[in-house]
Each structure stands twice: as structure tokens, then as C-alpha cells.
Swiss-Prot record:
The gene is heh-1. The lineage of its organism: Eukaryota, Metazoa, Ecdysozoa, Nematoda, Chromadorea. This is Putative protein heh-1. Disulfide bonds join 39-50, 97-103. Pfam families: E1_DerP2_DerF2. Its main location: secreted.
Amino acid sequence: MKTVIFLALLGLAAAEFIEIGYKVCKSDGTVSQVKADGCELTVKDGKKVCLFKKGSRPIIQIAFKPSKDTDKLKTSVRAKVGGSAMVDFPQTNSDACTYGVKCPVSAGENQIFEQSISITENHPAGEVIQVNWQLTRPDSGKEVCIIFLAEIKE
């Protein structure tokens, strides 16, 4: 088990994060930076778009300051594909405290959330999608809500 954890940490240490374009949606906390590893940044129609390769596991990193003390935060990811309704992106674990957030969370304390996502062969390629990433408190308050554009390539 220790070997698996060490290899996972080694993989994160070798990551090459780049700043991506994002917008903050309604949230209580303050987002200071959003980065990604495994993202090829391009510009389409004047907007920054992260290109993710099928079969890859890009990592998203969000630096933020929470507005309230809380015991835990939950992560959720949704995507808007082809102008349709938002679709939940499946996750095996939604506990943000397992992705670098120091819990219990203290208001005003800098935090870094870091989670990898799996881009499977089933994801549609060649279309720009809107990704909505949130970290919510048990009272349903949003500490983090960001939107960024992504495209999956073969």
C-alpha cells in the first residue's frame, strides 16, 4: 500500500501544470488560480480551451480561500455538451478532503484542491464542452465554482 501511495505522489510531483482560462461562477470562497496537467492549451473563438487526449488522466488544480469553517467539502464535475443540459461527470470519490484540501477547513486559509479525471474512449471528441467544477459544503453552500472550456482529442 505504501508503494502505491508513493508512486501516486511521485506522479503528482512530476506533473507539469499550466494556468488555464476559467470563470468563477457563484461561490462563497475566493479562487486565486486554476491549473491543469495534461492540458494542451489552445485558443478557439478568442477563448482558452484545454485539449485533453482520450485515454489520459489530466489533473486539475484549484487554489482557493474558503469563506467559512467546515468539516468537509464535496467535489462535483458537470459538463455541458453540445448546448444540452449539464451532465454529471462520474467520480469514484467525491470527498474533496482526499484531494489535497486540509480538513477541517478554516475560513481564509489557503487551500489547494488537486484531482485527476479519466478521459475514456467513450467521451466524444472534437467538440468544445463547458466544464463546471464545484466544491460544496454539507450545508450546500458553494466554496468553489469554476467554469472552463475543454475539448477531447483522439
